[in-house]
Amino acid sequence: PAWREAYVDRAARMVLRDRNHPCVLFWSLGNESGFGENHRAMAEAVRSLDGTRPLHYCEAGEDPLVDIVSRMYPEVEDLKREGARTDDGRPFFLCEYAHAMGNGPGNLKEYWDAISQSPRLLGGCVWEWADHGLLAERRDGKFGYAYGGDFGDAPNDGNFCIDGLCWPDRTPHPGLLELKKVYQPVLVEAVDLRKGLVRITNRYAFRNLDETFYATYRVTTEGLRALQRDLELPKGFGPGQTREVELEYPLPIAG
């Protein structure tokens, strides 16, 4: 209780600062900060200042206080089970997933295949955007990114701050390129390639594909372009729709 006013003050200042920004979708009560009466006081203050946006807080679990249920790092199968639940009408949000450290992130396509199949699943936030290294000169005169322990600091978290989708200078890691592919607003799937049939899904919420894109397709044989043609997209290809289209091409010699 001694910290109640500090909790409430921080939440109130956040809402007053940002509530007129249309890009703010919902409010969070914090990150990995336990759960108790001070958080309930924060929620009351937030709702008194902005009753138009929902509230999430991972540490609250499924407590009635929150409008959005959230978790960190569930396995894909657990996420599918959450998406299939009918006993809780609140949406489900991955406030952290796909830790991008080292050889991560992983299972991006699998996560988003699950998310796309359930209206209950909102999506999620990859931890995290950028590595937190500082450009420093090494003993050999070359430059590299320094992190915990490189400054004589103790204790430290070592390279645990090097876990982003891009380098500190914002050069993309491979994981960011994979995430871009997963996020693409147009999905193309093979139906029967010997007959040239593919399935196209418009993932946009407001755009017709035929009014947005000029489409082409390319056939390659052993990495070399064998054919490239224009593709006329179906008329009125609206948001959320899926259409099958036929591509005209001869089968490559390689089969």
Residue ranges and their predicted role:
Residues 213-254:
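Intrinsically disordered, low-complexity Pro/Gly/Ser/Thr-rich segments with frequent PxxP/GP/PP motifs
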Residues 1-199, 203-211, 216-224:
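Extended substrate-binding grooves/exosites of carbohydrate-active enzymes
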